[in-house]
Amino acid sequence: HTRIIKQYQCDRKVGLAVDEWGTWYDVEPDTNPGFLYQQNTMRDALVAAINLNIFNNHCDTVCMANIAQMVNVLQAMILTEGSKMVLTPTYHVFEMYKGHQGAKQLESYAETTLLNHDDQAVPDLHVSASQQADGSILVTAANLNDTAAIPVTCMLGGAKPTGVTARVLAGAPAAHNTFAAPEQVVPTELNTSLTADGFTATLPPCSVAAFVVNQ
């Protein structure tokens, strides 16, 4: 889509609006099928991370993107039951990625290994990066491999890093938060080592990470 838009747009900039993206599964048992209430797991967190990385990587064209939907419907960020509320893994990905908003997108490239399933193949690592107004750099990454960790060496061309912090959201593909256990899947600190031009870390299987590099 972005290639077509860039090829044919004239003097006026044409934006791409991505409406109602997200996962759509069978509804939870014993719920009204018309309400589209579904559980939200680490699998959905990976879907959110991939999509948000794509949107950031194509932010010169993507002008708006709306997840379907925010509360209790489809790939919801929040689930409620009476007076109770639980934050889903998808919510935590949005929170970890919020530094991309209003920042300057940086070109990024990842050397990856393909994951093969039936006749489909996808990269095991998905990344995006942006620079904040204060000069810090946010790198977001998703490990799509649900059985193997990925050692990561990030090189930031032209940067002079002075420190790095990182958080990771990880768990089994079906891991999720419930009203009885609302913090089963939450971001935790990720051990990261600073290098002369970036950092190194290891992404757990089925995980989403956000690295903030100060310089």
How would you describe each model-predicted region?
Residues 121-160, 166, 209-212:
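Carbohydrate-binding surface patches
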